[in-house]
Amino acid sequence: MSFRNTSKSSLATIDRLELVMPKYAIRGGEATLKCDHSVPLEQLHKVEWKKSGMKIFQYVKGRTPPFRYFPLAGAELNKEHSSEKQIQLSKLDFPASGSYSCIVSMETPIFSKESESHELTVIEPQDTDPVITFNKDTYEIGEILEANCTTSPARPPPHVTWLINNER
């Protein structure tokens, strides 16, 4: 006599796994990264977060404490807003830019799946409008105009396009 286990849990897989996060975040600000998956909490074993292949956060069900935090250059993990479903990065700086992913592992059956990686770019927008200065106050028709456009520091650097009478 043979027995076959055809229970639903033995056939379970991770049908849905998606990393939801912003593409850009402002330097000094924060970013919330969500690991949206279809694993019921009772079957969830572990969720890991990686930046550029390096582990930065881990949740393991049943471990005390369930969360572990790993060094992350250019950001702090906000412990109050991080869980098995999301992490929040705060005090962002340029080294936090990079590729992020989450890995979800089930208890029964033992199965893991990694999300697609997504890029986060920490930016610093201009804090003032560009300023145009001219070498002279007035110009005669046909005279060569010399001007300078100065922008405030920004990352990525601003792209400057000159228009004269709304034409390039």
Regions found by a protein language model. Give the residues of each.
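Flexible inter-domain hinge/linker segments at boundaries of tandem extracellular adhesion modules
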Residues: 2-19, 50-55, 68-69, 106, ...
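Structural beta-strand segments of beta-rich domains
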Residues: 29-33, 143-147
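Ligand-binding face of N-terminal immunoglobulin V-set domains in extracellular IgSF glycoproteins
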Residues: 30, 34-36, 74-119
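Conserved beta-strand elements of beta-rich interaction domains across eukaryotes
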Residues: 37-38, 54, 94, 107, ...
